[in-house]
Amino acid sequence: MKEWIVATKNKGKVAEFEAILGKRGFSVKSLLDYPAIEDIEETGSTFNENATIKAEAIAERFQRPVLADDSGLIIDALDGRPGIFSARYAGEEKDDQKNIEKVLRELQDIPWKARTARFHCSIALARPQAETIVFEGTCEGYITTEPKGTGGFGYDPIFYVPSHDKTMAELTQEEKNKLSHRYHALKQLDKWLD
């Protein structure tokens, strides 16, 4: 069994990586397994840059392949915000509830048809002595007027997926794994592994 390090401490992201990579026979370790490693500062201006920064920093330390993801919510009516600042949109404490409240306040006068949004995910694969490769995926939807559902994490309770007539937080983990932005990026990685 091959072991991959996923450069995140986000349990929700780890679960998505495990669900998808586990089917391929990979074992997933995350930065939760290495508590001594400090957070990597995301100094990039794009999802791709931030994912690459994290993957390369951890790969250099461990001298083995590392996957890092940077993802976020892009809302058209907010000119792409929160974007790369999705996790800390309402402040550095990275509070999901406060982030949701801020988005809903900013969209309160925006009609449904203009509440289009997408989750974007960039996954960087960094390997010692090799060029870093980035895989991207998106999931299109709308921002609801109020949170619905208890599953998932982050903005899932306000991200409506038209094809399922539910928010991401109302989907089962299995349903989410088949349509999420991370799933689409991991599918690109999976193709590359073949």
UniProtKB/Swiss-Prot annotation:
Swiss-Prot/TrEMBL keywords: Hydrolase, Magnesium, Metal-binding, Nucleotide metabolism, Nucleotide-binding
Is Magnesium among this UniProt entry's keywords?
A: yes
Per the record, the GO terms for biological process are:
nucleotide metabolic process; purine nucleoside triphosphate catabolic process
Entry's cofactor comment: Binds 1 Mg(2+) ion per subunit.
Cofactor(s) of this protein: Mg(2+)
Q: Which GO terms describe its cellular component?
A: cytosol
What are the EC numbers? 3.6.1.66
Q: Which molecular function term from Gene Ontology is one that the record holds?
A: nucleotide binding
Q: Which Gene3D superfamilies does its entry note?
A: 3.90.950.10
Cystine connections:
none
Q: Which SUPFAM superfamilies match?
A: ITPase-like
Entry's InterPro entries? dITP/XTP_pyrophosphatase (IPR020922), ITPase-like_fam (IPR029001), RdgB/HAM1 (IPR002637)
Question: Which EC class, in a word?
Answer: hydrolase
Q: Which residues form the active site?
A: 70 (proton acceptor)
Give binding positions for Mg(2+).
41, 70
Q: Which HAMAP family match?
A: Non_canon_purine_NTPase (MF_01405)
- Subunit field text: Homodimer.
Describe its function.
Pyrophosphatase that catalyzes the hydrolysis of nucleoside triphosphates to their monophosphate derivatives, with a high preference for the non-canonical purine nucleotides XTP (xanthosine triphosphate), dITP (deoxyinosine triphosphate) and ITP. Seems to function as a house-cleaning enzyme that removes non-canonical purine nucleotides from the nucleotide pool, thus preventing their incorporation into DNA/RNA and avoiding chromosomal lesions.
Please give the name of this protein: dITP/XTP pyrophosphatase
Which species does the entry assign this protein to?
Halalkalibacterium halodurans (strain ATCC BAA-125 / DSM 18197 / FERM 7344 / JCM 9153 / C-125)
